[in-house]
Structures are given as C-alpha cells and as structure tokens.
Amino acid sequence: MTQKLTPMMQQWHQCKEQAGDCLLLFRLGEFYEAFFDDALVLAQNLDITLTQRQNIPMSGIPAAYLDGYVDRLVSRGFKIAIAEQADNSEGGKGLVPRTINRLITPGALLSSSLLPEKANNYIIAISQVGSLYGLSCLDLSTGTFLVAEYDNTKDLIEAVYRLAPTELLSHAKFYQKNEPVVKQLQQHLRITLSEHVSWAFEYQSATKKLYTCFQVSSLDGFGLQGLVPAINAAGALLSYIQDKLLLPISHLSIPKIYGQHKHLLIDKASQTNLELLSAIHGEHGKGSLLQVMERTSTPMGGRLLRNTLVNPFYDLKEITLRQDSVEFFLKQEPLRKTLKRHLSCVRDLERLATKISTTLASPKDIGMLRDSLLSCMHIAHDLQSYTLPEFLTNKCLISSSLKSLIEALSTDLLQELPLKVSEGNIFADHYHQDLLRLRNIKTNSKSWILEYQERIRQETGIKKLKVCYAQALGYYIEVASSFAPQLPKEFIRRQSRLHAERFTTQELQQFQDEVFSVEDKLQTLETKLFKELCCYILQHRDLILELSTTIADLDYVISLAELAAEYDYRRPLVDHSDALSITKGMHPVALTLLDRGTFIPNDTIMHSAQTRMILLTGPNMAGKSTYIRQIALLVIMAQMGSFIPARSAHIGIIDKIFTRIGAGDNLSKGMSTFMVEMAETANILHNATDRSLVILDEVGRGTSTYDGLAIAQAVVEFLLFTEGKKAKTLFATHYKELTELELHCQHVENFHAVVKENGGQPVFMYEIAKGHSKKSFGIHVAKLAGFPLSVVSRAQQILHQFEGPDLRPEPEKAQQLVMF
C-alpha cells in the first residue's frame, strides 16, 4: 500500500500503524486531518464535511479547536491518536517529520472538560492467574491507584460495577476466555475496551514496572506480597499508560488495596433498585439518594460522598468517628456556615497537583492553587479555637513548609493570572531583577511613540500624521496620499492604501527591533521562571495531597451536618448488635419531594432473636415498596456516618444489602422478566449472610400462581432456617398464603399497608401496621389507571364469583369463544 502513496501519505500510514485501533488526527499546517475510514468516522460524529483528494476520503478540524472536538469524540467512546508535525521554523526543505506524541482514551484523561467534577474517572486493568483475578484501577487526574484480587467472577464484576470505570484494559487471550464477563460489564457500564501486549501482564514485567515507577525494590511495603494477579494487572496498567499512551506516571499515589472487608457491600442490582446514584426514571441523578445528600462544597468532598454512598463503612470505628464530627458541626452552626464559605473557594487540589506534576498547569491553575491554599489557611485558623472530635484532630493543621509555599505564591504572583504562559504578566516586579527592567522598557515604549509622532509632525508640518501598529507590518507612519510628496527622503514607503500611504524610518525600525526583542526576552524569562515555580510547588506535592484528603473529609462531615440540620435528621445508634430498630423512619428521597409534614413516618423493629423477617402485604400504591426501600436507605446512610430521617434508630452493622425489586426483560442475554427475577434471587440465596439485609418485592409473580407461591415460600424458608443465611428480610408480597407462616415460625411477623374504606372506595393511609392485609384493591387501582368502565365492571363481577362458593366464574355468553 505504501508504494502507491505520496511521501506524506506514507508518513500517515506509518503513524496509523502505530495508532492501532485509535482514530488518527494527523497535523497538516493549521488543521488536523483524518483519512480513509477515520475520515468517515470524523465526519459522521462531528458533523463536518467529508471530501476527497486523489480518491482518498478526508476530513479535518482546525488546530485551534482541537480540544473541543477531541472531547466530543472521547465522550462517544473513541480513542484518539494525535500526530504532531515537528517545528519547521528554520525553514528546512523536504517533508516535515510527524510523530504520534499523545493518545487520548476515555479512561486516561489528565485534564479535560469531560472529567466529572465530583466523580472519579477510572481506567481498570484485569489479569487472570488460574482461578484468581487481579484488578488494578487508576484515576490519572487525581493519581488514585487501587488494586484488588478476587477468586470468582461475581465478586470481580461487582467491584467493577462499584468503580464504574470508563475504560477496561486486558489482553486478547483474556477477552477471548472471559467473553461472558466482558459482555456483562459492557451491558451495564459505558465502557471502552482496550488491549495491551500479553507480556505486560506477566509477573516479571509487571513487578519491574512497579519497581521503576515507585523507586522501590520490594512491593511488600505496599501490602502486595503474594497478590500476583493484582501485581500483574497493576504493572500492565502502568505499562499501558506510560509506554502506549505516552503519559506520565510519576504523579501516581502508591497502590492501595481495594478491600471488600472494609465496606458494606451493595451489588449493582441493589444500587440501581435503591436509586443510589441516579433515579430509574429520572435524569442526571434527579430523584436519587445522592441528589438528596449532595451538600458538598469541593470537588474532593463530592467524590468522597459519591464513593462512600456505594461503599458505606463496615468498620464501626470509622462510622462513629464521622458521626461524632457530624454532631459537632450540627451544634456549631456559625462555625459550619463560616467553613462552608471558605470551602466553596477551594478548587480541586488533587487535580491541580496532577496538572503541575504532568507539566499541564497554566498560570491560572497556579492562581487557583494559591487561592485554595489561602482558603485552607483560613479554615485551619477558624478551627484552632475549638476542641475538635477525634476524626478532625490535627487534620487541618498546615505545616510550616506549606505556609512558606502559600506566602511565596501570595507575594510573588500577580492577582489576575493569564491562561497561557506566553501571555506573560505572571510574576510581581520584585520576583526577578530583570523583570522590572524589561517591563519598564516595554511600558516606556508607548510614551516614546507619542513623543516620536509629535516630533515628526513638527518636522514635516503634517498635523494628521499618525504612528500606528499592525501585526503584519509592525510599527509604521501613515499620512494621507496628498501629503506623501512632502515627506523627506529618509521616509521609506511600506504600503499604499486607497487614500493613504504608509512609511517607516530607520529610527522607527530600530525602535521596533528593540521593543520586539524586549517582548521575546520577557516571554523567555517568564516561561523559565514559571517552570522553576512549578518545580518548587512539586516539592510540596505530598503535603498538598494530604491537605486535599483533609479538606475532603471536612467537607464530607460538614455536608452531612448541613443535611441533618435542614431535615432534622437524628443520630442513629450503630453497633455490633443484631438489632434493626427504627422509630418514625422516613424515606429520605420521598421526604424531599413532598411538602413538609405530609410524609407518613413508620416504625421498624427487627432482631435475630425475635423478628428477623417481615412479611408485608397490602394493595399496590399503598406504600409497601417505599417502606422496604426506606429501610435499606436508612441503613446505608447510617453506615456512611450520616444522621438519618427518623426519631431514633438502633442499627446493628450490616455486611451486605440485597434487593429484588421489579425487573424487565434482558434481551441481550435472552432472559425473560421472570428469568431475571430468578437469577437475582439466586444471587441473594447464595451470598446472603446472617448479618445481611434482604429486600424482596413480589418474588414469584412472573409465573403461575401456584408456581410463584411455591417459589416464594421456599425462598422464605431458606432465609429463615438455613445456617449462615438468616438475613434480616423484608418481603413484600400479594400471596396471602405466606402470611400463615407467622403461625408456625416465631421469627416471622406480618405487617400490612393500612387502607381504609370510605363509601366503598379505598383511602391509602401510607401507614405500616401489624397483621396482614384483607383486600388487594387491585380493581380500584386499575380504575385509577384509566381502564374502560366496562372492563372494571366485569372485573368486579368476576372477583365476586371468585370470592363466592363457585370459584370458577363462567365467561359472559357474548364473550364465550367458539373453539370448534
């Protein structure tokens, strides 16, 4: 192919081979061009013109707008390779060299408008050694680096769901061998698949890459001893980032183990069913628990809240520490308001540190860092006079080294800083001895021009003579065409206009050379000083990241205190008991959607020695689903260290939450609604423990009545009597037959959603009371839904016949079908 192409297209072909499955943007002058299939992709996704040259499809984008176009492509899951042309300022002859200098993928964003402010942007790598799976996870924009190891695909998949990465890395053999796993991840996540060489996933290569990156000779200090699959995944991910994407890795934090035992586990189905991060029928998180709880003021605090929401604590100490801090700020309202004001001025310290580490920082970024650090100093000062809870003790103290940095940035930088280093005006005059001298020359040039203009007006007698500046011409003298013959011979013609002539002089040309030289010297000097400043800031990087963690923790607990104050939340007692007792509990999301005082609170009392299963009956629309979801949400909030919407609560720590609520067909897997329901229920039966909380809504409804009832009762009995599986369970059902279990098992208690009748019409009270429901009121709900009245009337007739002695109603004669 290359023999038939021009030299430039041969160069493109070489770059395309290196780019692999990336879309190649090839720099040609002031445009980035795409050719062949890439041109079609570019035109289709960016709505730009597709053209042809010598029968080669091509499309292009202006170099000045590259970042915006790249963001649009990456947001659609494309991987981009950028081929830049070498500097040809010296005017060398021949083809300008071009090489790929960066690759951009959805999971490897250092700085982009696509980065969510209050969420991480993860890329993960997975390796396999025998039956073990290694997982590594990176957020390049913050430097966060996590590793984990799993002995089954279920736990691996759930971990990936919780991390919600935008890109998955492995090698071809893994993808072939684990196709069902990969398809499942693609089905539930918007994730781009990437491949890397298989040898990078081998232990020797992986450890060497980790040693080099972190300047160590052993990984034992990171707690990775024996975790071969995790090490393989981590090393391969670093290799991919550095060697293939050509991105820096020196700013990464040391790898931390992403451990299951530290958190309350909430699987993907439960996250969705409970609408933790986004509402099932909402947009952009509206109607979710996250939307209700989001009161954070900083990007770091927002990310911490989001991560904790899907990974609540299982360690009682961690929960109590945060509860104490929330209580402290709840009582200290003036301090809380003051700190929130300061926190709102703190920018993303993690990502600013990454930008500086990777030489992507602009002067404006350094200004944001300076202002953020000043706000942190104000926070530390405001906290000094208080006796802080243990969680915050010493957290907001700023070291003397960091104080020196803050002082330097405050005194040495100008207040308003430019977006680009080339724009200058970054440092104060006193910062360097040559700055003031060069700036004075530049400033005095304006007065020199005015003086020169006035002098030659006097010498020539032309009062309307002007000295002007244009980018193409530089400085010039302009007079009306009629005055041009009066000018002395030393005036050199530069340009003729319709009614004017433009000239220069030796004196003006000499002045221009001096001014331009000064501007070049100023730009060179400030560029050099800016690089030195970034190096100085990097000496404090670890302190900045430590401060970032502190600010995130502080923002987190203050936001929970704000939430508690706004809705009068109370502190739950969380301990190692097996109690689940909630008085006057309310659904945190529904509470915000209704007028104050209109939500009906309900109690819950469960205890392994007494009631550990509630069978909940009642008609649709009476509040059953809201109630059982409410219990799960309150447990999650409590184990986040948050206060909850309840008068009081006693919650023994829960290890896992499972939900089986609603379903739809899974066409991509060839699974019916009932099959999805059974698969989710099977997962619960296999993985629930005595310390789990299980929420079941209408299990068994997707098949015949007796089949469904049999399945439902078998599930109930399994969770009641199987050792190690005796989870606290709330089971909402329409099967009245199940309520008889209360007579035979002391651990089962019937409750129902209260409905009163008024003139034969049901009135939903949204109260949960002891006992089982007597009626379902399904026909009434059908009427409310808009059923034709004739259908409603016929349904009532059939219901009366079912409830009478003859349990097999005959079809109306007019409706009987003639079968033969």
From Swiss-Prot:
Does DNA repair count among this protein's keywords? yes
Q: Which GO terms describe its cellular component?
A: cytosol
Q: Which residues bind ATP?
A: 618-625
Q: Does the keyword DNA repair apply?
A: yes
Q: Keywords for this entry?
A: ATP-binding, DNA damage, DNA repair, DNA-binding, Nucleotide-binding
Record GO biological process: mismatch repair
Could you tell me one molecular function GO term of this UniProt entry?
mismatched DNA binding
Source species, domain of life: Bacteria
Look up the coiled coil feature and give its residue ranges. none
**Role played:** This protein is involved in the repair of mismatches in DNA. It is possible that it carries out the mismatch recognition step. This protein has a weak ATPase activity.
Note the NCBIfam families from the entry. mutS1, PRK05399.1
* Family of this protein: Belongs to the DNA mismatch repair MutS family.
Give the protein name, as stated in the record: DNA mismatch repair protein MutS
Q: What is the lineage of its organism?
A: Bacteria, Pseudomonadati, Chlamydiota, Chlamydiia, Chlamydiales
